[in-house]
């Protein structure tokens, strides 16, 4: 299995999984994808169903990941997934349980049973194990430079804290996260963790990360890698839970006609991109529903064919803050597939059109028609009032308390439910404890606090303020990172 860049030219070399694991962004500014997606036949899915039932989620994940990874021995890969997906790190032995959301006609895939109560743990726990394995094998070290709108940062830091050969520099948008999210990150005092509050929004943080990655000399000197969803291994981990979701919703003997549709609360497009990849592999996923908040750039694209990222000033601060994103970094991976895996066409859209015009327009093209007909996408959006009403309604009808982002998903799911046949699964994003103020506003009471999080907001915190400057960020990395530590 070899990997290519979404902006590849005819002479661009392919890379191995272990190389791109540590590299993150491709040198040409593109994102890595497999040369071709492996396929899962009905018999493959039947076998994975047996493995999931008898051996558990970690063994099933190893079977899927092995299709994409041929430079890590199978036994080592199985051990890696077993360490990543274990109890008590995950509070439910199923890792990803799926159940019916009573009274709604919907299912809910529970992705928030990990250490930080967010779906990002599903990828980060695996990434931490893969990084440590590969760095030990090479006798190397890595500086992770990442950006977070709320959940990626804490998930990455909990997965990587104290690991040999790894330093983490995590950028956050100052004042844009909840008190719980800030406490989860800033209370980590490990020497290999550097928390940074940037004067800007998440997209500014993400741009700084990309700028550091585009400086080839600095990247090589400081061994810069990525945990954001620009890292292919993140998406690979997420593909696994879409397979598990389909297996858990369908019956024994289900075939390609047993479609399961999913609703994915979306900001950076990584989560739903993993659903797209699972669908391309042959997992019988029906409609892929992109659910956005008021920062509805993705909804605009799927409705009109126009992709128009907003400026930092025009990115709204909402009550589902982890989706306050207007430049969806993983979107390029899907567009590459949509454009027939044409690197030149993808580069023309993301380098030329966006830089020149601030948008690109696929309306009226065969590609726009293919969004729904070939790739199964549709979308919807949710407002502050919508998510508050949904949190209150679902608690009253189902006895289940949603976090604001999952509430966006359930709101959109109710809207599209009449047009979709078969099971419709909302992919949960986090536990409500992370968003206490919004839960209080919606329901009149605070969310329950799991025992492992009691007192977290009163702990000592450490964070470094930073101007929105790539040179200032590089200076901070030089000052705070210990090479080889």
Positions of predicted regions on the chain:
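PLP-dependent amino-acid enzyme catalytic core
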Residues: 1-485
């Amino acid at each position: 299995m070899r990997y290519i860049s979404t902006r590849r030219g005819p002479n661009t070399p392919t890379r191995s999984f272990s190389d791109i694991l540590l590299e993150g962004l491709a040198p040409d500014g593109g994102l890595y994808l497999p040369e071709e997606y492996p396929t899962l036949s009905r018999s493959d899915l039947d076998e994975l169903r047996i493995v999931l039932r008898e051996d558990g989620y970690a063994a099933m994940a190893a079977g899927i990941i092995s299709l994409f990874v041929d430079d890590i021995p199978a036994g080592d890969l199985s051990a890696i997934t077993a360490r990543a997906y274990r109890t008590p790190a995950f509070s439910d032995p199923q890792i990803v349980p799926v159940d019916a959301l009573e009274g709604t006609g919907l299912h809910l895939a529970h992705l928030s049973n990990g250490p930080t109560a967010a779906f990002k743990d599903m990828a980060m726990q695996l990434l931490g194990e893969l990084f440590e394995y590969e760095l030990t094998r090479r006798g190397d070290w890595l500086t992770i430079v990442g950006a977070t709108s709320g959940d990626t940062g804490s998930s990455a830091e909990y997965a990587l804290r104290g690991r040999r050969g790894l330093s983490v520099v995590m950028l956050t948008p100052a004042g844009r996260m909840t008190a719980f999210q800030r406490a989860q990150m800033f209370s980590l005092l490990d020497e290999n963790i550097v928390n940074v509050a940037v004067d800007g929004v998440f997209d500014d943080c993400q741009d700084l990360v990309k700028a550091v990655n585009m400086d080839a000399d600095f990247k090589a000197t400081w061994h810069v890698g990525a945990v954001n969803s620009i890292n292919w291994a993140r998406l690979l981990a997420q593909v696994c839970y879409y397979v598990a979701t389909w297996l858990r919703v369908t019956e024994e003997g289900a075939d390609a006609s047993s479609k399961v549709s999913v609703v994915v609360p979306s900001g950076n497009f990584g989560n739903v991109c993993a659903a797209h990849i699972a669908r391309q592999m042959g997992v019988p996923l029906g409609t892929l529903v992109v659910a956005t908040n008021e920062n509805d750039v993705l909804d605009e694209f799927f409705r009109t064919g126009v992709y128009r990222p907003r400026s930092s000033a025009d990115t709204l601060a909402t009550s589902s803050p982890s989706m306050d994103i207007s430049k969806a970094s993983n979107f390029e991976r899907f567009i590459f597939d949509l454009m027939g895996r044409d690197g030149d066409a993808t580069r023309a859209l993301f380098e030329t059109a966006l830089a020149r015009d601030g948008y690109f327009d696929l309306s009226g093209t065969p590609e726009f028609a293919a969004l729904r007909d070939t790739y199964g996408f549709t979308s919807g959006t949710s407002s502050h009032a919508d998510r508050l009403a949904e949190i209150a309604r679902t608690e009253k009808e189902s006895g289940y308390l949603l976090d604001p982002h999952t509430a966006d998903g359930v709101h959109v799911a109710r809207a599209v439910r009449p047009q979709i046949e078969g099971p419709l699964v909302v992919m949960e994003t986090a536990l409500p404890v992370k968003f206490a103020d919004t839960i209080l506003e919606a329901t009149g009471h605070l969310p329950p606090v799991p025992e492992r999080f009691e007192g977290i907001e009163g702990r000592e915190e450490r964070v470094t303020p930073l101007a929105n400057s790539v040179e200032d960020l590089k200076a901070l990395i030089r000052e705070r990172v210990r090479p080889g530590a």
